[in-house]
Amino acid sequence: MGFVLYNTLSAELEEFVPINPPQVNIYTCGVTVYDDSHVGHGRSLIVFDVFRRYLEKLGYRVKFVRNFTDIDDKIINKANEENKDFMSIANRYIARYYLDMEAINVKPANVEPRVTEHMEEIISLISKLIELGKAYESDGDIYFSIDSFKDYGKLSKRSPEELEAGARIEPSLKKRNPLDFALWKASKSHEPGWESPWSYGRPGWHTECVAMIFKHLGETIDIHAGGIDLVFPHHENEIAQAESITGKPFARYWMHNGLVTVGGKKMSKSLGNFVTLKEIYTKYHPDVLRLLVLFTHYRSPLDFSFEKMEETKKAYERLKSAIEDIEPLKAIAKEGKPVVDIDFYSLEKSTQEQFYKALSEDFNTSLAIAHIFNAVAELNKAKTESFKIGYITPKELEGYLFLANSLKQTLKDIFGLLEENTLQNTLKTLEPASSVNISTEFLEILIKARNLAKENKDFKVADFIRDELLNYGIKLEDTKAGTIWKKP
C-alpha cells in the first residue's frame, strides 16, 4: 500500500518511494542527555515510533537510528555544578531515558549511537571538509564556510541574508561569515576533549549527526526526522556538510513534527514550562500520553495542558471499556431479538479501510484515530443497549468480539496502545525509593533499563546501573535464566 508524505525539503506532499525497497533507513535526532526527558521530547519520540510501526505493518524493513548527544556544553555545565565527571551525567540520564522509553512503550532504535564513540569518524569528516575547501581553521576551532555551499538555506526556504537577519548568532571575530558554524571547538585543558589535528577539543553539534549517519546508514538515507525547531540551523547545517562531501542528496525525505507548546509558548527547559515524562506516566497511564499525541496531526502544534490530559484520559477509558471490558457482556449472552441494528463485520471492514487511508495521506493519525473512535462509539452503544435490555444475542456478541479484537490488534500493532507491560503497572503504584532502601519494584525497573541498554550494546549505561546499585549494596548477576540480584 502506497502513501504520501509531506517533505519539508520540497514543501509538498510526495509519494513515498524508498531508495532500496523494502528497506527503509530512518535517522531521527535524539536527546542531549543532561536532564530528564519532557513531553516535548516525548511527542517526537511517540510520533516516529508510531510511524516506524506503520512502515513495518506495511511490510517495510526499517533500520531506525536515533542518537544520544553525550557531550555538550549543557552536560559539562551540569557536571561542573555537581562536581562530577561529564560522562557520569550522560550515563545517568541515558539510564533514565531508557526507563522513560520503556514506560511510554517507545521501541528501542535499531542503533542508538553515542557521539563520544564516534570521534574518529567526526575528525575524519571534518578533515575531508577542510581538504575540499569547505571548512577553515581559526585559532584551534574549525568552521564550515556557508559561502562554499550554494544551496545553503534550501531546507528552511530562506536565503543566507534572511537567515542571518532572523537568527540569534553569537558574534565572533573567528568567523568569516556570521552564519559559519563550528565543526570543532577547542577545549580548555581542564575541560572534556579529544586530540585532533587542530586542537584538543570537542565536536560541534551539527557535525556529530552527519558522521553517525554516514557510518550507520550511508551517504543518502530515506528519511531524516526530527522536530520542526531543528530545521534551522541544525538540519540545514547537516545538509551543507553531507552534500559538500558526497555531491548527493543527504536524505530523500525530511519529516518534522510540530512543537509542543504551553499556553502558546514552546515547552522548553529554558522557559521552565516543561513537564517531564516521569511526571506524566506516574500520574496517568502512559497510553493517555500516546493518545494525546495521536489526536493531533504530527505537523501541527500541540498545546499541552493537564485539562487536555484529563479529557484524553476519559476518551481512553471509553476505548478500553469498549474493547477490553467484555466479560460482563459475555455473561448476559442469550437468544432473543437483535438488540441493535449494527453490522459489526461491515463496520470492521470500513473502519480498517478508513484508518489506513487516513495514515496514507501524510500520516494523519488524528483522522485515523477518529475512525477508530467512531467504531468504539458503536461498540459502547451496543453495550449500553444490551445492559439496558438485559441480554445480547450470541450472534451479536460474536460480531462485537470480532470488531473489538480487530480494533485492539490495530491499536497495538501501529499505535502501540493497549500493550500492558509490567513496568507500566509498577509505575502506577511506585513510591519513590529512598537511597538506603530500594524497593523491589524499582529494582526490577532498573534491571529492565539495564537489559535494554545491553540489547542496544550500550554497555556504558549497563555498567553504570550495575555500579550504582553496588553503591547500595545490591549485586547484579547475569545468568542464563536472566539477571538476578542479591541484597546483603
UniProtKB/Swiss-Prot annotation:
It comes from the Bacteria. Its EC number is 6.1.1.16. Keywords: Aminoacyl-tRNA synthetase, ATP-binding, Cytoplasm, Ligase, Metal-binding, Nucleotide-binding, Protein biosynthesis, Zinc. GO terms for biological process: cysteinyl-tRNA aminoacylation. One of its GO terms (molecular function) is ATP binding. GO terms for cellular component: cytosol. Its cofactor is Zn(2+). Zn(2+) binds at C29, C209, H234, E238. It is an enzyme of class 6 (ligase). HAMAP family: Cys_tRNA_synth. This is Cysteine--tRNA ligase. The gene is cysS.
